[in-house]
Amino acid sequence: MTFSLIRRGATGSAAVAALVVAVACQERGKDGKLLDTPTSGNIRVAVDETLRPIIAAHIDSFQGLYPAAKVRPTYAPEAEAIAGFMASDSVRDVVAARRLTTEEEAELQKQHIIPVQTRVAIDGVAVIVHPTNPDSLLSVAQLAELCAGKAPEWSRLNAENKLGTVTLVFDNSASSTRRYVRDSVLRGEALASTAFATKTNEELIEYVATHPGAIGFIGVNWISDEDDAAVRGFLKKVRVAALTTKRGGATPRDFVKPYQANVALWRIRQKAEQPYYPLCRELYVISREGRAGLGTGFASFVAGDKGQRIFLKAGLVPATVPVRLVQTADDRPAPAQ
């Protein structure tokens, strides 16, 4: 049984691609210097640190395809990445796990800039625990209790769990994962006062791997590509929790991990007949260019066929390349490419 989940034309990438093709020669600036083109030049882009593995793969592929193009990424927590994009026209694009706010759009319009916001993929927020933690099946309601500090001890969820104090860990105090948990899991409620942040995603994984009572939150793209040796190393150190949206009466089949197929089902969650992974978010490439420069070219690449297939191979859900789900013997949907 197959399901066609992703519709083409959802991001407007075709319009961006047409704009790129329309540029047949290099332009010159007022000073007479050659300007960058969609496939050549040297630019800076800001990238949410949570998305580093997948966007680094896109940059490598883009520069391999266009040797005259140099895309210099600055990886930073979401708040810093977007602030840098807003503050300087030297940062052409920002890659983030949200659209710009109405206030941010208005600020750019004061600068006579109309940002182009292109949806490129769906990522998830994975929940990781120590391998010895017996509670790796969690409902979203239980997760909210842990995040709010209402269940400060693991024994509050399971009397047989002797791991003691629950320690919430994020990759950065200004990261998109922390914001997502606050906005989408806690619905604006404050995080537990005991929550803390490491400096990097690698440090977060290492902390959870060495502290049995810890529970961490990390972008799925850090653990989704099992062809990557680093990812396989991470997965040997921690356990990825399976989640359900059910509040009571859940069976083991209702709990799902952030596999690509379960993230894809999130897109049709209103109609989905199977459990879907609940902690998902859409990724955007946002450009401030007023012409067809290298920033537009890179955004077009990420939203185009080659860029979308990079997301697909890495275990994320591309925005425009259709993903078919094939029912497997164990009744768990698997992506067919």
Task: Cite the ranges covered by each PLM segment.
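Bacterial N-terminal signal peptides that target proteins for export
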Residues: 2-14
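Peptidyl-prolyl cis-trans isomerase
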Residues: 112-115, 135-137
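Short, glycine-/small- and polar/acidic-enriched structural segments
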Residues: 113-120, 125
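Exported/periplasmic ABC-transporter solute-binding proteins
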Residues: 25-67, 71-79, 83-87, 121, ...
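Bacterial N-terminal signal peptides
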Residues: 12-22
